[in-house]
Amino acid sequence: FFNNMAIAMERLKRDGKISKALVLDIDLHFGDGTVNILGGRGYATLVNPSSNSPSDFIRQVDKALAAETYDVIGISAGFDYAREDWGGVLGESDYTDIGRMVRETARKSGAGFFAILEGGYNHRVLGHNCMALLEGMREG
């Protein structure tokens, strides 16, 4: 199988563009493929917030972003934690906040940042939530 996040991180590492990376996996489902590939590499920290509370979820994201300085932050952007999806937790404004937090953290440290769409099951809201994350990533 292919794992888009692992391919992106491995390429950046192989090309000498990064030493330390954060994978922020905001998908409801644990990213075991990402962990299986990157978990033992030593340069990548993988964080998969999990909560039934939007504020607690955001606190976990904030804690992960503040823990260390990274050369790149990659968001595994699954949107099944959305209120209108299986997870039933995060709203559009939460996704905007996550994007903004990643952008601000990356800019402070000079890191790069990107997101890879990993999924979401409710197609009526998937595009809106994806746009909300991207809006946060591009603001300012």
Which functions belong to the PLM regions below?
Residues F1-G140:
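A general "terminal functional-core" signal
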